[in-house]
Amino acid sequence: QETLSEETERAEGGSPALFCGDTLFAGGCGYVFDGPMRVMAESLCRLASLPPSTLVCCAHEYTLDNLHFALSLKEEGLEGEALRARALEVIALRAEGKSAVPSQVGLERLTNPLLRAALQGDQGVSFERVRRLKDSRAYRQTSLEALLQS
């Protein structure tokens, strides 16, 4: 069985780096194709237990779409200003042709609604609710720009 220490490596600056494939994304997480949602929630909780400075090196750059979803939730307790600032930063990076990846575990704990839902400690019930909302893509009915202005 893998341990967290086996899943991380030290990055050049001394920060640990997590190479998490399709499990955790900047602002989101991967799809759950089969198996219980609880298992994905448990996996995310393990990753969230890493030090806040741990670099999150995910397999895909979906950050802007994930933050679009996060802004659409208007989730109580989701740090609105931090989320808005992160979205604006990612927009600027993407306009320059740069990636918003890697992220950091601490930033994900603050602004990633799927990770935050997994951390609720309710056997994955909150995570499943938020994951299904993301899967519905209903958030795309409101533009990111409109959400940033609200």
Residue ranges and their predicted role:
Residues 42-55, 62-150:
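Accessory terminal helices/loops
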